Every structure is written in structure tokens, then in C-alpha cells.
């Protein structure tokens, strides 16, 4: 009880000291994003064939696994991936749904493994972002993507986590030679569902 009280008191003190800087930084980011929206091309992409492929993948996952939570996660992720591809926009409620489904899929015995999976999945992206910021003073990964990555990390095992993110980054770098601004979340959707399909088929 005393430890709990000390921990919460420490958190309250640290938050009171750091919150102004956090708020001002978020406010600055919101203003910058607003300016980008004002100058952004209003055309929204339409990809009907790709949409059909993306939205039928959860059906395949369910057919192979009979796991409704996994299939539901894939469906919500397909919505996120398509909206990011089409308009570079991710609805907030889909982020919450992804996290909720990912948390529901956890078992108590998997908590430590899930923590490592999230960490391994995030690490290559964080290193890539840090490299871009230090050398180019540029954001190479959209900040909104980091709201999606933990949910994906919770749905995979540690042995595949880092390699999946590395594949995501390599594919983005490869395809960006021909197509500008490849959305990383869309690529992550295909690698995640591809990995799940291979696992369910016994390929890996």
C-alpha cells in the first residue's frame, strides 16, 4: 500500500512538471498537421481491386484458424490500412478497437511474451526513425503509425516481431523508388496477414 502511494505520488509530481512541455509539443504538432491539411491535395485515392483483396483476407484467416478475435483484428486492421492508403488518415476509433481486440486476445500467461513482442516489433521502427531524425532532421515514420504498431505487436510472437517490422521497412524503401509516400501501416497489414496465413498453413 505504501509503495503504491509513493509510486502514484511520484507519477503525479513528474506529470505536473512535464505536462506543460508535453502539451505545448502536441499543440505544435497539431498546428503543423493542420497547415499540412490546408495545403494537401484533396483527391482521395480509390483502389477497388486492392480493397477487395484486403477485406477478404480476414475471411481466409477465419477459415484457417476459426479464431474470431484474430479475424476481427485483421478486419479492423484492413480498414486502417485502406484508409491510410487512400487518404493518409486513420480514424481514431479504429485505433481503440485494434487495441481492445488485441488485449482481449491475450492470456495471462502470455503477458511477458507479449511485452517482448511489442518491444521487438517497435525497435526497428524506432531505430529507423532516430536515424532519419539525427541525419536528415526528418520524420521518416508518421507519428500516428506508432499507435497501430503496439496492437500488431500484441498479436504476434517475439520470434517473428522484429523480422516483420524489418520486412515492412525494406518493402517501403523498395517500393518508394517508384511510388512516393508508401503508407507503412498498409505494408504492415500485408506482412501481418501474410505471416498469420503462413503460420496457420504450417509454412513457418
Can you name each region flagged by the protein language model?
Residues 1-204:
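A membrane-topology feature that recognizes alpha-helical transmembrane segments
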